[in-house]
Amino acid sequence: MRQFVLYASFTLRWCFEDETTEATESLLTLLQNEEALAWVPGIWQYELLNGLGKGITRGRVDRQRAFLLWQEIQELPLRIVEIPIDRKLLELALAYNLAVYDASYLSLAMEHHLALATVDGKLQPAARLAGLDIIAP
């Protein structure tokens, strides 16, 4: 089974038709078929729900569809991991010039030696520097 760390904005690409790509759809299909497991830090849920909320207020998705998407994503094979909020996380953020919440994704990927599915312009090079594989859209 393929396993990887899933960044929130990568996940949101599944929710907005103009942002989907072959790569994002391929990962979604793997998860839907239970051929993959996505690891996410606890903050991922807040970021995802916030992104859906912004999508509603900006007219990119209607409420009913957003709630349906939220439910469908929650049913995917996910391993939600609470990342300790401590000095180590801050040190990682500073070392790679990342926001602390982005460092939580990097920390999770590094700890479990997993690829990182991300669209973030700062997180991708940080993951490469850390020796991690990147799954990009």
Region spans (language model):
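Alpha-helix capping/helix-boundary segments
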Residues: F10-T11, W44, Y105, K122-L123
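Acidic, PIN/NYN-like endoribonuclease modules and their adjacent C-terminal/linker elements
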Residues: M1-Q3, L98, L106-P137
